[in-house]
């Protein structure tokens, strides 16, 4: 299998259909019915459980009620046809035409370092830089050694900002002092910069790559550019497509967004730019469509697997979100070669969702304790001691991870699976701690809550799942690093826990679930909800900067591993923008994003 390759070639096309975790589909297997892209009727499911073991009023009064909407997508993706010849046609053109064209430009001695860095930035924006990682790293390593000379006379804000972004993304800590040249005698950014709209937008994006050590200048740049861009976006002097581009950036900047979503938007923007490179534009479109074909195949596999589990009908207390669970896996790695990794992450995530929902929204504390105790034993025989719904959850967990183990063991990735088992047990213990607090009516301090909440956030687990299929990374040192609880993973855990608690606060309070980050912060510090939320948001921003700092300072971990961590940090705003819990209620913006990636190919 070609999972570990840096780029794909024609010879790797068949691997998607060869692995046991993938479902080979054809039009005859899944005939297309008359389907609509309109969401299904969203009748909410309210469940009050009964069990064989007890029907006492005391037991049932201690059981939560659940209110989740059914899946928007159902079995839709089983009906979407994929033509294998389209894979071949796109890959052939990329290999024979597109890649040689770009590679020639990257290695040409006629192009300056500045020109090459601007080209690299464009490749990143179009979502095609991953084809040229070795060339890019070679160019940037050499250019960074000559950085002072390269930027000595440079006074173009857009160019400096682009270089800042590219170098930092590739772990070269270009100093934010490079922006001092754009300050006036009063020490503030010059007002004359406002006329350079492209430079202002690029500085705004670059400012999101700041670290704790360069906080002042980056925060000033972010505030300065945002204030002026908000005014400029309504200006009639700016072309409509550029005004829309600014508006998108102000809504969610690219470094708090998924790479594939950035590329999808940027391709449309770039097509409207005067003097755009037709070959690069076509490359971006072909690459996106090629990725999309992989995603559809993967969704077929996952939809069929999830349908076979029959969890929604057996456990309506579990959120039926297989498509929404798969979608963020594109945030970790969107490249075609990571198909296996995305399927593994999606399966692991949905079983964690099932465990969480049962413990959080259905089981009484004694039942949750029995389930988690059985999970710790990791023994299929333990299911006989559990009520029916707990048996379903435990069997789902054990069988899914067993399936992954059978897939990865021949690849020499057994340590990955054992770490996954250990982390799943740890997650279960943390869920049980929350269940115990709820059953006792105990309100922990914020510090107590975060000790458990950082575990239930599951960012360690999500990062771990992403490592499983990274076959080009040596297992032993990778998991030694993981076991050391590195600062970057701690920051991700805090970042997720805080963002999640802010957006789920109202839903949880309406269900009577008072143990959350917002409430515990209010309780410990004696502040209002609004004050608590503001402090938590500041804490989240600070931890994002820690992630960036660690990306730039860690030298003994392969860059692809650290990029997975950065990509995790980029996910949160996609699901938590403006206080909406998009995963639980995916009927608005998240549905539109999913549609833009999976449903609509880009016309070439």
UniProtKB/Swiss-Prot annotation:
Q: Which UniProt keywords apply?
A: Cytoplasm, Lyase, Magnesium, Manganese, Metal-binding
Alphabetical list of InterPro entries matching this protein = Isoprenoid_synthase_dom_sf, Terpene_cyclase-like_1_C, Terpene_cyclase_plant_C1, Terpene_synth_N, Terpene_synth_N_sf, Terpene_synthase-like, Terpene_synthase_metal-bd, Terpenoid_cyclase/PrenylTrfase
Motif (DDXXD motif) positions are 356-360
Q: What is known of its domains?
A: The Asp-Asp-Xaa-Xaa-Asp/Glu (DDXXD/E) motif is important for the catalytic activity, presumably through binding to Mg(2+).
Q: What is the cofactor note?
A: Binds 3 Mg(2+) or Mn(2+) ions per subunit.
Domain of life the protein comes from: Eukaryota
Could you state a single Gene Ontology molecular function term?
magnesium ion binding
What is its pathway? Answer: Secondary metabolite biosynthesis; terpenoid biosynthesis
**Subcellular location per the Swiss-Prot or TrEMBL entry:** Cytoplasm
Q: SUPFAM superfamilies given for it?
A: Terpenoid cyclases/Protein prenyltransferases, Terpenoid synthases
Amino acids binding Mg(2+) 3: 500, 504, 508
EC numbers, comma separated: 4.2.3.-
Q: What is this protein called?
A: Terpenoid synthase 30
Root EC class:
lyase
């Amino acid at each position: 299998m070609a999972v570990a390759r840096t780029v794909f070639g024609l010879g790797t096309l068949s691997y998607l259909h060869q692995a046991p975790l993938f479902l080979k589909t054809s039009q005859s297997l899944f005939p297309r019915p008359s389907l609509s892209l309109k969401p299904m009727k969203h009748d909410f499911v309210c469940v009050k459980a009964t069990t064989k073991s007890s029907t006492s009023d005391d037991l049932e009064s201690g059981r939560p009620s659940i209110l989740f909407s059914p899946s928007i997508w159902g079995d839709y993706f089983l009906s979407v046809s994929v033509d294998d010849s389209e894979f071949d046609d796109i890959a052939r053109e990329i290999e024979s035409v597109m890649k040689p064209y770009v590679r020639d430009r990257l290695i040409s001695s006629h192009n300056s370092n500045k020109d090459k860095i601007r080209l690299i930035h464009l490749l990143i924006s179009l979502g095609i830089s991953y084809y040229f990682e070795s060339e890019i790293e070679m160019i940037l390593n050499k250019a960074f050694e000559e950085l002072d000379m390269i930027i000595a006379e440079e006074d173009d804000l857009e160019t400096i900002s682009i270089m800042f972004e590219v170098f930092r993304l590739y772990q070269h800590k270009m100093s934010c002092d490079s922006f001092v040249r754009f300050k006036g005698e009063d020490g503030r950014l010059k007002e004359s910069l406002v006329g350079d709209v492209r430079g202002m937008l690029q500085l705004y994006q670059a400012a999101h790559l700041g670290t704790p050590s360069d906080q002042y200048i980056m925060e000033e740049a972010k505030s300065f550019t945002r204030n002026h861009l908000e005014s400029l976006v309504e200006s009639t002097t700016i072309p409509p497509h550029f005004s829309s581009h600014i508006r998108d950036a102000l809504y969610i900047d690219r470094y708090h967004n998924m790479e594939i979503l950035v590329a999808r938007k940027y391709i449309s923007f770039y097509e409207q730019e005067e003097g755009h490179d037709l070959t690069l534009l076509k490359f971006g479109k072909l690459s996106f469509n090629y990725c999309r074909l992989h995603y559809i195949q993967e969704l077929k596999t996952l939809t069929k697997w999830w349908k076979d589990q029959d969890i929604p009908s057996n456990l309506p207390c579990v959120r039926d979100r297989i498509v929404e669970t798969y979608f963020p896996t594109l945030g970790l790695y969107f490249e075609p070669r990571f198909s296996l990794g995305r399927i593994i992450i999606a399966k692991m995530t949905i079983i964690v969702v099932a465990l969480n929902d049962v413990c959080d929204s259905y089981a009484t504390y004694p039942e949750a304790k029995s389930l988690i105790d059985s999970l710790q034993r990791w023994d299929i025989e333990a299911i006989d001691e559990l009520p029916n719904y707990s048996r379903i959850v435990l069997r789902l967990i054990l069988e899914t991870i067993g399936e992954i183990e059978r897939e990865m063991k021949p690849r020499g990735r057994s340590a990955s699976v054992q770490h996954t088992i250990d982390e799943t047990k740890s997650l279960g213990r943390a869920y049980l701690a929350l269940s115990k607090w709820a059953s006792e009516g105990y309100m922990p301090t914020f510090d107590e809550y975060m000790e458990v909440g950082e575990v239930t956030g599951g960012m360690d687990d999500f990062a771990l799942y992403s490592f499983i299929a990274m076959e080009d990374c040596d297992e032993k040192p990778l998991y030694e690093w993981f076991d050391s609880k590195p600062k970057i993973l701690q920051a991700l855990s805090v970042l997720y826990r805080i963002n999640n608690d802010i957006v789920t606060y109202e839903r949880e309070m309406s269900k009577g679930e008072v143990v959350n980050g917002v409430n515990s912060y209010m309780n410990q510090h004696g502040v209002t909800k609004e004050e608590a939320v503001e402090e938590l948001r500041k804490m989240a921003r600070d931890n994002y900067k820690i992630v960036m700092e660690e990306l730039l300072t860690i030298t003994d971990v392969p860059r692809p591993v650290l990029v997975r961590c950065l990509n995790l940090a980029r996910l949160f705003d996609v699901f938590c923008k403006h206080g909406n819990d998009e995963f639980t209620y995916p009927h608005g913006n998240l549905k539109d994003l999913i549609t833009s990636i999976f449903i609509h190919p880009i016309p070439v």
